[in-house]
């Protein structure tokens, strides 16, 4: 590629990425400006809803984070390494593909008044669950699958497998292996995953509306309600509540770091003292239960759904917005990985490491300033801020694993950088690209706040309809919306899996 053309491409690439990440700036300004006034803080803390909302947020977030971690560790201790672990990992995409709103809707239909399990667990219904315990438990089950998916990549390292086999052969229990080897080895990946889980659990609005306490709601929901009001004082309280969510995230990070440091001091040396093996029944049970929750979710929604009431406009909007946002993100990320900077890319991960509410507020501020609110383009642009980092999460490790010797051989043959990109790197990246496309579509179709705010309510999607119907109405209509919100990502996952299998069959002669 000629040098002027390459520079033009790099400039265009930076400009497009900057447009997507530009809301980070107004988001910061929205939070900083009211935070400088003591009067605004006094008005926030004087609100009678704040203490209970804060307590419900802390309880639900703690249950979600700690519960997801415990479930993941129990499953790892019970199954890894071995064929059962491989089978469980193969079934995880069935749960990962289910959007949070669809999963929460199925839980609501089970535990709400009149649900199948209402008589057995009445306390977990939203009207009675003032502390968000049901919300936290639902998020713990859903996020444990994500945590297992992240850790599965780290646990596949050959040296880690060899060391676990050695400890097992020497008679050390599985919990000793977990404490002495696994946790220190997976700590970096585990820390980033837990940060994403805590940030999302703190700021989740759609799932909290469906399953969380109603009066007062969680801090994220009450902040969202204040931000959407026309009164400037209420908007200021909403901005400060969003800042309070970020302060809570920082407190969780600090507490987790201190607990980690304290735990590290308790790790003894491998001194030959064995401990008796502990029963692995809880981990085995959870390993069976996790994939089944996805199947049960589909079955329950399919039984209750009234297909004659499906909103075709919401279905078309969800499909087109998800596909367009995913295609744009995929094209930008492939070009970014090739011609973008190789270092200092931490800012790309900020949308999944920070609470979503202030970021959406920044998007809305920018859209109002540019007079783009209420447009289809603005909604797709809003989705990209979350679709891109999740797809990058899949693509970047695979890109870094490309064998540099292949690139060197192509360069010795006189191939240009563009030719190497299209004929060497892109074919090698086909399977990760398909996985990233499926994940990106699932993330895009699940967006609630960007769709509602940037679209000004003009573009209904399956997610916005399901959240609206969860407050009251026909269970059949609610189940139908949630079922199609669940089926679309599953169809995309299935299609990408079939394409990957077909490509593997076609390329088997190259092995």
Swiss-Prot record:
Residues 54-255, 315-496 form the ABC transmembrane type-1 domain. GO terms for biological process: transmembrane transport. Belongs to the binding-protein-dependent transport system permease family. Residues 30-62, 113-130, 211-239, 306-318, 367-374, 454-485 are periplasmic. One of its GO terms (cellular component) is plasma membrane. Probably part of the binding-protein-dependent transport system YnjCD. Probably responsible for the translocation of the substrate across the membrane. The chain crosses the membrane at residues 9-29, 63-83, 92-112, 131-151, 190-210, 240-260, 285-305, 319-339, 346-366, 375-395, 433-453, 486-506. It comes from Escherichia coli (strain K12). InterPro entries: MetI-like, MetI-like_sf. This is Inner membrane ABC transporter permease protein YnjC.
């Amino acid at each position: 590629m000629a040098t002027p053309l390459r520079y033009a491409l790099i400039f265009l690439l930076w400009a497009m990425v900057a447009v997507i990440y530009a809301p980070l700036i107004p988001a910061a300004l929205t939070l900083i400006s009211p935070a400088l006034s003591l009067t605004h803080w006094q008005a926030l803390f004087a609100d009678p809803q704040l203490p209970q909302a804060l307590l419900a947020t802390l309880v639900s977030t703690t249950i979600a984070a700690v519960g997801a971690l415990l479930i993941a560790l129990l499953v790892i201790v019970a199954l890894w390494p071995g064929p059962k672990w491989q089978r469980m990992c193969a079934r995880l995409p069935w749960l990962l593909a289910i959007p949070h709103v669809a999963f929460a809707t199925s839980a609501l239909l089970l535990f709400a008044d009149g649900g199948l399990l209402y008589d057995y667990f009445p306390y977990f219904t939203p009207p009675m669950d003032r502390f968000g315990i049901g919300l936290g438990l639902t998020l713990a089950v859903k996020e444990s699958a994500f945590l297992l998916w992240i850790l599965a990549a780290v646990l596949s390292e050959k040296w880690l497998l060899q060391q676990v086999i050695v400890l097992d052969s020497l008679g050390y229990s599985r919990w000793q292996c977990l404490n002495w080897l696994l946790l220190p080895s997976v700590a970096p990946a585990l820390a980033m995953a837990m940060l994403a889980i805590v940030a999302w659990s703190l700021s989740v609005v759609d799932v909290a509306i469906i399953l969380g306490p109603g009066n007062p709601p969680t801090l994220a929901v009450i902040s969202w309600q204040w931000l959407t009001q026309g009164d400037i004082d209420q908007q200021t309280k909403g901005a400060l509540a969003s800042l309070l969510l970020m302060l809570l995230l920082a407190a969780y990070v600090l507490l987790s770091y201190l607990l980690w440091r304290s735990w590290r001091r308790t790790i003894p040396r491998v001194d030959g003292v064995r401990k008796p093996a502990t029963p692995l029944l809880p981990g085995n049970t959870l390993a069976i239960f996790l994939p089944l929750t996805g199947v049960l979710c589909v079955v329950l929604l399919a039984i209750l759904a009234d297909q004659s009431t499906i909103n075709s406009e919401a279905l078309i909007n969800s499909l087109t917005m998800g596909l367009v946002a995913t295609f744009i993100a995929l094209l930008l990320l492939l070009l970014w990985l090739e011609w973008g900077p190789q270092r200092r890319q931490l800012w790309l991960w900020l949308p999944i490491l920070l609470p979503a509410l202030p970021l959406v507020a920044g998007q809305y501020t920018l859209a109002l300033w540019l007079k783009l609110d209420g447009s289809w383009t603005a909604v797709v642009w809003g989705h990209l801020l979350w679709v891109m980092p999740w797809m990058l999460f899949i693509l970047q490790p695979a890109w870094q694993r490309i064998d540099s010797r292949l690139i060197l051989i192509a360069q010795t043959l006189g191939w240009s950088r563009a030719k190497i990109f299209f004929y060497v790197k892109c074919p090698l990246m086909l399977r990760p690209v398909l996985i990233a496309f499926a994940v990106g579509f699932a993330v895009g179709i699940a967006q609630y706040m960007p769709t509602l705010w940037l679209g000004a309510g003009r573009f209904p999607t399956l997610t916005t309809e399901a959240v609206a119907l969860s407050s009251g109405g026909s269970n059949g209509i609610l189940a139908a919306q949630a079922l199609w919100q669940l089926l679309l990502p599953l169809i995309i996952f299935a299609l990408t899996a079939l394409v990957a299998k077909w490509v593997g069959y076609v390329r088997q002669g190259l092995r």
